[in-house]
Regions:
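Short, flexible loop/turn elements at secondary-structure junctions
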Residues: 10-12, 96-100, 114-118
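Conserved catalytic cores of phosphodiester-cleaving nucleases, focusing on short active-site segments
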Residues: 94-96, 108-116, 131
Length: 396
């Protein structure tokens, strides 16, 4: 029986171990030998059965990436992704590779991101950049999210309320998979805080948790088998969580489960349905961030743009018939040349507007809206034309 060799490159050893813990859920381990092969690297020799067949794997952990000017390893696993089209300085938590018999070359199988943070506000899209940049290389991508997470009282640290993301964020992974024909999904797993007796989780269907689907997907991917069945299951559960979040979204100006279902079936698109709803763009911006002509610009955007999937995300769509009027008012606020204005008007497509908060002055989060533009591309299309305005509480 030929041994197959894999490497798990992780941001740290925890990510490496967590991936193997997922895999071990669904295999019947006959024998396992774990040893250090260097001061930083662990090797697992595993003999197991899966679906009544016997296999031998060697899995080598490589914790710590070559990034931030570190040279921990001889080769940088991210070089392969960059060569394939990854262009953002955003890296996933872990990458699984298969080591070939010839020249010990590594083939990237998939990338994985873990999230145990509170999925609310801009925190929910801050990692969309690494998903977008990785998937566009043709590399499958799993974003594994611990659910549920609570907002805590700042004084007592007691749980206040369950916080959930805008449903457009998990749906963006489904849309991106359909657009790019490369598998990417948000997979939700049960967190340590999950309490089924909590009235806030009444009627929550725990069958949406994806621990076993993740395991089966990874095992079959590593074995070289067809993974369509498990990809479909993960995407279906991804959609079910979109529906759950949309049911529990506050206010009437959000896509509902029936809306997401129409989009998923291809009956309409996120942009077309947003224009059909005609919800005025309504992103609220803090008064302290209203510098320069931002206040006037936001008024112009509200005049011509509709919110995408809801009213209060920081992006909107200006229908093609409104573009000329919008540009005319915009050039009265900002020194935009005629050539630049003509670039916006030269096609017969809608224009997307994206407002990115550039930084927070306290320094607690110097990239509060990172991932916003990739999130918009994943939700709509990377071929859409987007006008981006970066703002912040700057005095000059």
């Amino acid at each position: 029986m030929q041994i197959q060799i894999f490497k798990i490159h992780g941001d740290n050893i925890v990510e490496c171990e967590r991936i193997f813990n997922f895999i071990s859920r669904r295999i019947n381990i006959i024998d396992i030998n774990k040893q250090f092969i260097s001061q930083a690297s662990i090797q697992l020799d595993v003999t197991f059965t899966y679906n009544k067949s016997k296999f031998q794997w060697r899995i080598i952990y490589h914790p710590g990436f070559n990034k931030s000017n570190r040279t921990r390893w001889d080769n940088n696993i991210f070089d392969s992704l960059k060569a394939a089209g990854s262009f953002l300085d955003e890296t996933p938590d872990a990458i699984i590779t298969q080591v070939g018999s010839e020249e010990q070359k590594e083939k990237i199988l998939c990338a994985i991101e873990f999230c145990s943070a509170l999925q609310a506000g801009n925190q929910a899209w801050q990692r969309s950049g690494r998903a977008y940049s990785t998937i566009r290389t043709g590399c499958p991508y799993l974003y594994i999210v611990d659910f549920v997470k609570y907002e805590l009282d700042t004084t007592t640290r007691k749980r206040k309320a369950i916080r959930t993301p805008n449903p457009a964020i998990p749906y963006s992974y489904i849309n991106n998979t359909q657009q790019e024909n490369v598998f990417g999904a948000q997979a939700f797993v049960k967190s340590e805080e999950f309490d089924e007796s909590n009235p806030l989780l009444k009627n929550f269907d725990e069958s949406v948790f994806s621990e076993d689907d993740i395991a089966d997907y990874l095992i079959n991917l590593m074995l070289g088998y067809d993974t369509t069945e498990y990809e479909d299951s993960l995407l279906d559960k991804n959609l079910r969580m979109v529906n759950y979040f949309s049911i529990h979204s506050n206010g009437q100006y959000y896509f509902k489960p029936d809306d997401w279902q129409r989009i998923y079936k291809g009956e309409t698109t996120v942009l077309e349905l947003s224009k059909e709803k005609k919800w005025q763009f309504g992103k609220k911006i803090a008064e302290k961030s209203m510098t320069g002509h931002l206040r006037e610009f936001v008024k112009v955007v509200k005049k011509y743009a509709y919110g995408i999937s809801c009213k209060d995300l920081p992006f909107g769509v200006i229908p093609v018939q409104n573009k000329a009027s919008f540009v005319k008012e915009m050039v009265s606020l900002y020194p935009i040349s005629l050539n630049e204005a003509q670039t916006i008007l030269e096609d017969d497509h809608d224009l997307l507007i994206c407002l990115i908060k550039g930084f927070k002055p306290r320094g607690d989060d110097n990239r509060p809206d990172r991932g916003l533009l990739p999130f918009l591309a994943m939700l709509t299309s990377e071929h859409a034309k987007v006008l981006t305005l970066i703002y912040g509480p700057m005095t000059s």
